[in-house]
């Protein structure tokens, strides 16, 4: 019949079930068995006050959150979807004017859907950004220092023995430092200290 809305199926289920009882049925994504029928009379808490853990917002005609699903997802088609809790990996608020970070996640991720993506919470970059830029060492200085350290260890450890030579007192390294430069490298008129010229 023309003008009557067609009910939609839930996505990602091996046996799709139709969510009935609403004028505009919503879709629950990723659940094997949808627990809550959004916007229907069955989704409201019973009048006797029996608690229903699958209803997130009690006494609400349109509960938005699903509890107890193996991998809870955001309910699509809501004006302001809420974050689904009781999930190992909480989802980020999607299609919201003001998205918020995941709730209860040990590693929160970047807030998506905003004009300016925020810094990942709990990352090293976020800690450096909060610190004073004058007191924090520059990135180039740290990289240069690391490169010098790596290049030094590479040059010293390139010998077959693996250890760098240590100059001894009176050894050939010390004698080589005390020897004068060859005659063809001396500047004209330079004093020759080894011959007693001043």
Curated annotation (Swiss-Prot):
Cell compartment(s), UniProt: Nucleus; Nucleus, Nucleolus
PTM per Swiss-Prot/TrEMBL: Phosphorylated during M-phase.
Region (13 x 9 AA approximate tandem-repeats of P-R-V-I-V-G-(S/T)-P-R): 7-125
Residue positions, PTM Phosphoserine: 13, 78, 87, 96, 123
Repeat recorded as keyword: yes
Annotated GO CC locations: nucleolus
Protein name, as recorded: Ras-related protein Rab-34, isoform NARR
Origin species: Homo sapiens (Human)
Name of the coding gene: RAB34
């Amino acid at each position: 019949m023309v003008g009557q809305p067609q009910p939609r199926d839930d996505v990602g289920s091996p046996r799709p079930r139709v969510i009935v009882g609403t004028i505009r049925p919503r879709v629950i994504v990723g659940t094997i068995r949808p627990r809550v029928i959004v916007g229907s009379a069955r989704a409201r808490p019973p009048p006797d006050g029996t608690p229903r853990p699958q209803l997130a917002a009690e006494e609400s005609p349109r509960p938005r959150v699903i509890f107890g699903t193996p991998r809870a997802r955001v309910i699509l088609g809501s004006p302001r979807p809420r974050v689904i809790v009781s999930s190992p990996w909480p989802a980020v608020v999607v299609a919201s004017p003001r998205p918020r970070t995941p709730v209860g996640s040990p590693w929160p991720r970047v807030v998506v859907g905003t004009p300016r993506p925020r810094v990942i919470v709990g990352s090293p970059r976020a800690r450096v950004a909060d610190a004073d830029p004058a007191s924090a060492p520059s990135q180039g200085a740290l990289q240069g220092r690391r490169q010098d350290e790596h290049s030094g260890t590479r040059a010293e450890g390139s010998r077959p023995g693996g250890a760098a030579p240590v100059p001894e007192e009176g050894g050939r390294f010390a004698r080589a430092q005390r020897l004068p430069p060859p005659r063809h490298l001396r500047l004209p008129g330079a004093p020759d200290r080894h011959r007693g010229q001043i």
